[in-house]
Amino acid sequence: MAGYLPEPLRMMVTNPAISDFTSDGPLPYALRQKFTGWPPPPAAADISLASQTVLVTGATSGVGLEAARQLAQLGPRLLILGARNLSKADGVKRQLEQDTPHVAVQVAKLDLEDLSSVDRFVDGLHASAIHLDLALLNAGFFANDDRMTPDGYSSLFQVNFLSTAYLAFRLLPLLQTTTTAPEASPQGPRLVLVTSEAHAWTTFPVPPEPAENSLPILSSFRQKESLGSADDQYYRAKLLLALIGKELSRRLTTMQMATSVVITTPGFCASNFFPDSVMTRLIQLISARSIQQGGALHVFAATAQGPQMHGAYLRDGKPTGLSKFAEGPQGQILQQRLWVEMEQFLAGRGYLLSSILKPSSPLQIDGPV
């Protein structure tokens, strides 16, 4: 019967955490959307991205598009859109340049179902001598299927975690060599990872410590017969993304590096994230946040200043803890094991963390790239 229900109702009805009535549970989550998560909207007079270079992924529709629109209104010198569908991205570019003619918008191909596409995207930024002040990694998706990518991973896992985390690591050198203009990036460069409150609706068996060339966490998403439901693949991918963001922020702090990492979620918004239906529209009307509110939460995560922001997980626009599992002893072990696996994964693709995670002297950029 549940299989005939539209999303996200089916996801709620079949949720294994349905009996969790803490703030992490799915029912409190659904009830909270209309009444919380209203950070003050950024005003150009208070927040300016002048002289900054901003990257947004997943900006051709939904919350990502709205976040890109709101960020453009804050006046960055260059707004880069990483997108799989270049035709849609070009349409967004034209609209943004019409609405904010003082902002240069650049579009580049980025398909998170293809790790080589991530490499080509970042290599293109390097070739253009682009240095980032802000990277908002918003791209993600949900589909109730078990599609695999050409790289051999579950599509849900690769898009929502692996390629996003890989992109984040590869962007770090570009964030660390940012502009030095006085008005640019007073908070320092920032990396924003978009997870989901759904990370709290799952756990993850802690694997044995990985041996050399053994990646038990990542490899578990290559075996179709053991993937589990699409829902749980999505939940676990978002859990892993939150954990890698936490560990990355901790290590950047230890190394006294300038880049701040913020983990955020826009909550349930009235977007095209789920397939369209009359019931879905009704559910959105009753309990979803608006696209504008979701975009504002992204912009808040990208621009809010203060020492409490680095390493923060923002829910409803406020710093809070991750799920009980993520913050507990098993989650902390998983976080460390995941870091080791990502280090090996990067090395397998020719990138050593020791060369990525090192302070670089800021570079002066005289004009738009």
From Swiss-Prot:
The keyword Aminoacyl-tRNA synthetase does not apply. NADP(+) binds at K88, D111, N138, Y234, K238. InterPro entries: NAD(P)-bd_dom_sf (IPR036291), SDR_fam (IPR002347). Keywords: NADP, Oxidoreductase. This is Short chain dehydrogenase rstn4. Transmembrane segments: none annotated. The gene is rstn4. Coiled coil: none annotated. The active site is at Y234, K238. It comes from Aspergillus nomiae NRRL (strain ATCC 15546 / NRRL 13137 / CBS 260.88 / M93). The lineage of its organism: Eukaryota, Fungi, Dikarya, Ascomycota, Pezizomycotina. One of its GO terms (molecular function) is oxidoreductase activity. Pathway: Antifungal biosynthesis. Signal peptide: none annotated.
